[in-house]
Every structure is written in C-alpha cells, then in structure tokens.
Amino acid sequence: MHFPIVALIGRYQDTGLDAPLRALAAMLTQAGRRVLVDADTARNTAVHEYPVATMQEIGESASLAVVMGGDGTVLGVARHLAPYGVPLIGINHGRLGFITDIPLQDAHDALARVLDGNFQIEERMLLQGSVWRGDALMYTASALNDVVLNRAGRGGMIEMRVELDGVYMYTQRADGLIIATPTGSTAYALSANGPLLHPGLNAMVLVPVAPQSLSNRPIVIPDTGVLNMTLTAIGRVETGASAHFDMQTWSDLQLGDRITVQRAPHTARLVHPQGYSFFSTLRRKLHWNQMPQVSDNIE
C-alpha cells in the first residue's frame, strides 16, 4: 500500500478549511489510510474526529503529508519535515501556488491517483543560513525559497562584501540581496528580475534588490559552495539590516556581522501526480502562450 499513514496540515487561521479537510479525511479513510491531523490545524478548525499529532510526531510516523493552503504554508511544513524525509503534496487554497500546484477542486482526483501509485517524487534543495557575530553563532535556519539580506524599514542602503568559498566576488550597495534556490527563483527573486531556474538544477542564484550600480546583475552559482556575506555598512540606524529565511523567520543584523549560506543537508520531497511538468506550471501561473488581443479602444 502506498502511503498508509497520511497527515493533514492546513494553513494557519484559515477559516475556510473545515469542509475540504473533512472531505479529504473521509476520502483517505475510505481508501484504507490512517489519518492524522496536525495539532495546530486541529486547534484552528473544527476537525477533531481524527488523531492529532505534533509536527515532530508527523515527521516520525507519517508516510505522506497533505498540505492545504498557499505556498507559504508549504514552505513552513517543508522545513519541518525535510529532516524526516516525509514527502508532501500541496493543495492550493491560497493565491498563486507554484508549489501547491494542485487546485482545490482537483484534490480528490489527484490524491486518488497518488494513492494508486501514479505519482512522482521531486527532491528540492534547501539552504542553510547562519548569522555570525565575531566567533559567536547568533542565529541559524533553513529555507526552501530564499535567504534575504535587506535594509530595515527606516534604514538606507546596506553594503556587503560577498565571497564564494573564500574567493572575493564583489562588494554591493543595495536595498538587499536575495540568495534563492531553484524553487525560490519563482518567488521574490523573480519579482526582482532574477532568472527562472529549473528545479532539477544543483544551483542557487544571487539577485540584488534595487542595487546602486546599474551594472549589478543576478548570478547563478553551484550549490556546492559556501557563500559568505559581511555587512560592511548600514544606513542611518543601528539595527539597519536583517536576514530573512523564507520571509518567515529572521534575525536582526549589526555592522560587521557575517552571514553564511550553503546547501542544507536535507531536501524537501514534493509529491506530484504522474505527468506533472514544471513547464506546465509556468505556463499556467505566468500566463505564457496568451497572445495579445487586438483592441479598438484608445487606452
């Protein structure tokens, strides 16, 4: 039997999840699977009929996690479950949904195909970022999308010295710097004019945010190296910069802090129904292949 124990995880404080979660749980039970409900999801919904499990318990016992929400929900769950190797499938109950690629209305059909063995598993790399103050480790966290260094809300530009494996790359003045995985190349990095990276690439991309020099451009580097960014100037206020991990956890930065970023030891395992295509997702989400329409209206 494929995936005998299935965990259901919903977006935090989403008030519209009760009915679709119950329907999925009933469908899974009818298919002979044991259903667990994430503890936070159970607290935030009225779905109390099934065994409740913490994220750690899900990691230790579940064979599949079904995540209902947006991409942000999947990011958080993926970081928690990656060390356990539990695969997850995303049901889109958010907006854009690059990672939660299954529409809510198709959830039952897609899950039925997966339970029947018609699925593929995709390994997605994570980043591990650490903040150092002298020799002291101040903060460390993983990220599926990106690690972002940026100026504080009241601060000006920040300046950082960037090295790869101890080799000097450049010094940059900008509002920020995005270090993104292939998964993250469709997120914040894309809005900052970064390139799209195929998820099969073993690479990460550095994308400047509003750089002072117009010659600054994104650069793709191998995922085997260790990036080292030293904060050499901050703008106008003492706590003028911060490091963000998937924009969900963060650390304040001080002048002279050093931030290291490298590939994390674990991967996120994403389950897709057989026939999934990254390019199909791009076409749908970015509206490729839609030709301009001729209009007689004066704009």
Curated annotation (Swiss-Prot):
Similarity section: Belongs to the NAD kinase family.
Annotated source species: Bordetella avium (strain 197N)
Keywords on record: ATP-binding, Cytoplasm, Kinase, NAD, NADP, Nucleotide-binding, Transferase
Listed cofactors: a divalent metal cation
Function of the molecule: Involved in the regulation of the intracellular balance of NAD and NADP, and is a key enzyme in the biosynthesis of NADP. Catalyzes specifically the phosphorylation on 2'-hydroxyl of the adenosine moiety of NAD to yield NADP.
Reactions that this protein is recorded to catalyse: NAD(+) + ATP = ADP + NADP(+) + H(+)
Its EC number(s): 2.7.1.23
Gene3D superfamilies: Probable inorganic polyphosphate/atp-NAD kinase, domain 1, Probable inorganic polyphosphate/atp-NAD kinase, domain 2
Protein name: NAD kinase
Taxonomic superkingdom: Bacteria
A cellular component annotation (GO) from this entry: cytoplasm
Major place of residence: cytoplasm
PANTHER family on file: NAD KINASE
Residues the entry annotates as binding NAD(+): D71, G72, N145, D146, R173, D175, T186, A187, Y188, A189, L190, S191, A210, Q248
NCBIfam families to which the protein is assigned, alphabetical: PRK02155.1
Gene Ontology biological process: NAD metabolic process; NADP biosynthetic process
Enzyme class: transferase
Active site: D71
